[in-house]
């Protein structure tokens, strides 16, 4: 009796259309952002083991009712994996609608507000989810999901501690929730990194 060997041909690969469009788009966006060049910092680094936050530079970058402190960061302190910000939003203030290819975690230190979270699985963010946030809560932003943090409280400040991965941050900004992901505008270096990181030169 002759035994036949089973066929050894490779199993058929699933068609590309079977791959989730959202996953494909997210991977393309992440690859595009991660391929951007990063220049060396031109700022002196503070390598102190202990630093007094009350003595750190606090700026609003032209946004009334907003303040930002880089508590520890890639350009000013030489961190490689994470960066930490302390941000305060006055009543009614909000971030731009934006996305980035890094992980981001918020800890609400005081006040209350609203997280608006869009989708990266469509061609544009779409109608955002509105999620209430308040003191002693924490929330995380999925990589490349468009979002906005808004102090929707009319009577008190919203203060948050923000932790991001893969600094310095590369941010894509949307005009509104219906703007296609491919039309979002890159802002790099971001405002608080401009003093330490010059904008990339146009090589053309």
Curated annotation (Swiss-Prot):
GO cellular component annotations of the record: endoplasmic reticulum lumen
Subcellular localization: Endoplasmic reticulum lumen
Pfam families registered for this protein in UniProt: Auxin_BP
Cited function: This is probably a receptor for the plant hormone auxin.
Subunit structure: Homodimer.
Protein name as it appears in the record: Auxin-binding protein 4
Locus of motif Prevents secretion from ER: 201-204
Organism, as annotated: Zea mays
């Amino acid at each position: 009796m002759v035994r036949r060997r089973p066929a050894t041909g490779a199993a058929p690969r699933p068609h590309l259309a079977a791959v989730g469009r959202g996953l494909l788009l997210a991977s393309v966006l992440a690859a595009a952002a991660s391929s951007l060049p990063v220049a060396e910092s031109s700022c002196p680094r503070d390598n102190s083991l202990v630093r007094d936050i009350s003595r750190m530079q606090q700026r609003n970058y032209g946004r009334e009712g907003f303040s930002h402190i880089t508590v520890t960061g890639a350009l000013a302190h030489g961190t490689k994996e994470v960066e930490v910000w302390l941000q305060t939003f006055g009543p009614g203030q909000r971030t731009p609608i934006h996305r980035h290819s890094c992980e981001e975690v918020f800890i609400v230190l005081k006040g209350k507000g609203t997280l608006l979270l869009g989708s990266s699985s469509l061609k544009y963010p779409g109608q955002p989810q509105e999620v209430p946030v308040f003191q002693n809560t924490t929330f995380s932003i999925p990589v490349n999901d468009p979002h906005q943090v808004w102090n929707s409280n009319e009577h008190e400040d919203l203060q948050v501690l923000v932790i991001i991965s893969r600094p310095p941050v590369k941010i894509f900004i949307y005009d509104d929730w219906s703007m296609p992901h491919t039309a979002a505008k890159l802002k790099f270096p971001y405002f608080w990194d401009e003093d330490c990181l010059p904008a990339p030169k146009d090589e053309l």
